């Protein structure tokens, strides 16, 4: 199953658990979100929802984050948002930050809230994606839109979306260096982190990284093992942690900037899931018995905990650790 198809299944499971329909009541509404900017250093700006800081602090679900990196020649945008409305907001914030052209835009994954806005970019802007993201969007955009409309609601700017895929592709396990003029940005594939096409954007000059969805937000949010691969995901997050200097700042997929040490919460959670599920597998427990045992109440606090932990992450870990 492809990563985005797993994502669909996960959101459907969430709707079942919560007893709600996203079409009527989405986690966040693309018609209502208001984006704001925060300067993280000269030429480095994070864009996130106005209520993101409050939602992150109480374990709520915030809208997609974005950002801008500016060099002497032009700028690079991180993630292009769900629809025309949100894309227009981040482009307006970018124009306030610099009169220089938008040379590049990066999609950290194929998820629509990170990439649907590609079609609204200036024609001269070059889109950077992983090869896996390009292949998925080229083959499955119609299915993806149908899912988004069914579960996130009509009239939220999804209907007009057409594919605009990568001009520059990051190969599996590779990276692309982008020269913005006096500033080189690294677009890195550290390995499987949620979708199999996850890209991390690193500006070494400011020591700021954008992670996309592998890091949803600060504690108490948790990783989503949407396509399984617990062991690989844990390994990738450890690589990211080791890569970052101690004073780095991290802009997550759905929240305000955090520090390097804040990644420990996500790494420690996955490590504990691996430890406890492996013990259950070694004792030949069934999946149902494993879910009942591996409750990990010390990691509660995230509004989606009662779905993401017992219904997604523990079953994904059980499947991964049961492989021959």
Feature annotation, model-predicted:
Residues 9-20:
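Bacterial N-terminal signal peptides
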Residues 39-93, 199-203, 207-213:
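Conserved beta-strand hairpin/beta-sheet module of binuclear metal-dependent hydrolase folds
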Residues 47-62, 139, 219-230:
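Acidic/histidine-rich helix-loop elements
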Residues 1-11:
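Bacterial N-terminal signal peptides that target proteins for export
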Residues 24-26, 242-247, 256-324:
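Accessory terminal helices/loops
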Residues 72-76, 84-129, 169:
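Active-site metal-binding motif and surrounding structural segment of the metallo-beta-lactamase
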Residues 24-32, 38-39, 74-76, 82-84, 133-272, ...:
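Metallo-beta-lactamase
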